[in-house]
Amino acid sequence: MLGRLFSAAAIVMGLSMPTTAQTFPDRPITLIVPFAAGGPSDVLGRLIGQSMSATLGQTILIENVGGAGGTTGAARTARAAPDGYTLLIHHLALAAGATLYRNLPYDTVKDFEPLGLINQGPYVIVSKTGLETRTLAEFIEHVKKSGRGISFGTAGVGSGSHLCNMMLQAQLKVQFNEIPYRGTGPAMNDLISGQLDALCDQTTNSIPQIQGGRIRPYAVTALQRVEQLPNLPTLHESGFPNFEVTVWHALYAPRGTPDAVVQKLSAALEVALKDPAILARFADLGTTPYPVGERGPAAARAKLESEVAKWRQVITDSGFTPTN
């Protein structure tokens, strides 16, 4: 009797799963941005979310859950029901956080279903316009002399800005005053107003402010110059051959999300990444999408795993003590 009941239940579940996938989504989806509004991840999340919303026929609501270098928003996603209605956009900080934090409430590699890679691009080292330096050489000399007298913003431990700062301090053999924010959006506001001295931020956030003359750029952290800032040198060409920090974003769902739902969301992301308007916006912001055929769920999982290993080595070598 029990065997027949279990068999019947299995048949019902098997029949219902395709229906669930076919009708998904039948209500709004929440896309968690683990940093404050106005920052690079927020900008990208809204761009991608708007396109995916049109493809899926449902509203995608952006929820900014900042704090702890992006781990607060990641934890919220990991705890969510694995039904495709809670998504996460995150960048390299998700991978680095696996080493930077001792007691994360999730397993970085196991607790997320990658939906696809979105974009990749460099950071730009910038300062307030009131700083009396004009060139990278002058800025570096000023940082070395000032030490903790100069303030650099970060989006918290484990954020890309924090990792960039970590590498910069190691290369210059200096410790400066790091000011944590809930995202580089608020940090950029303080930089523009002159309350913050310097910041290492993504091109998506910094290029519009540079072009508007509201902040001063010194160098990019990629191996090649940025097309939108052709006169801005790379740190690599400026005497720091081992300095490279490249940001990458990916989209995730909680572990256990049905494969059919993962594929449907991944397909909607692919539509967004082929949208000419989004590609034009990416170009304006100095970032590029991952190549077609190299950005699906499997590629995103491989990228996450390799980046966890990469940053574990970098952070361990730096002597950084993991935080709680």
Residue ranges: model-predicted function:
Residues 21-110, 149, 173-202, 209, ...:
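N-terminal (or domain-start) structured segment
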Residues 107-117, 175-179, 197, 207-245, ...:
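Short beta-strand->loop
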Residues 26-28, 237, 259-324:
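An extracytoplasmic/periplasmic, membrane-proximal ligand-sensing/linker region
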Residues 79-85, 99-186, 235, 248-281:
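Hinge/capping helix and adjacent helix->loop/strand transition within the periplasmic-binding protein
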Residues 16-18:
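N-terminal signal peptide c-region/cleavage motif recognized by signal peptidases
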Residues 89-94, 154, 184, 201-206, ...:
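Beta->alpha turn/N-cap motifs
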Residues 1-9:
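Bacterial N-terminal signal peptides that target proteins for export
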